[in-house]
Amino acid sequence: MKKSILTHKIKFSAIFFWGIVFGSSFETDSTKKEIYFPATVTSSAGNEIDVAALAKAHIMIVITIKATWCPVCRQQLLRIKEQLGDFEKCNASFLVLSPGSNEAVHEVKFNTDFPFPFISDQNFSIAKKLGLILSPEEIMPAIVILNEDLSVKWIRKGRNILNFGDAELKDHLGCANWI
């Protein structure tokens, strides 16, 4: 009887562990419904960004952060910043989408020193289009690759301390070993 209880506890622990590691993330190819990113946006610094032109010149990757206070999201930006050399090989450019005021979002940019524009999605209009509203104050963390026409090519939703998604992004892009 005790062995049976122990076996069930071990099975439950394993399922619980894998649920934490992989349960908060999934990726999809955007083939079911066309979702388009806005052609122009305003950065947290107040600069207009021509996303349409960027998407024609680069592989556009949008990193969403849950909230300006999210430590895992900040860590994600630092992880990607450390790997920018790999992403430059495939001509990638980034935008960071966050809820919050321009000031709070710009502070995240300053604190992470991430060298790409940050966008404050104060009214959640972009997050809503992408299906990424987590709560009235939070956006679901995600990595989004845009096509040249600004439609969503690939999206990987979710992030946690054990599973950031940058490896999946690099695998999907397939350019880390380009010369």
Language model features: what each stretch is:
Residues 75-113, 124-128:
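Structural microenvironment flanking redox-active thiols in thiol-disulfide oxidoreductases
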Residues 54-80:
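Short active-site neighborhood of thiol/selenol oxidoreductases, capturing the structured segment around
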Residues 24-53, 75:
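N-terminal "domain-start" segment that seeds a small globular fold
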Residues 3-13:
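Bacterial N-terminal signal peptides that target proteins for export
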Residues 140-179:
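Thiol-/selenol-based redox modules, centered on thioredoxin-like
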Residues 13-21:
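Bacterial N-terminal signal peptides
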Residues 115-116, 134-144:
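Structural micro-motif
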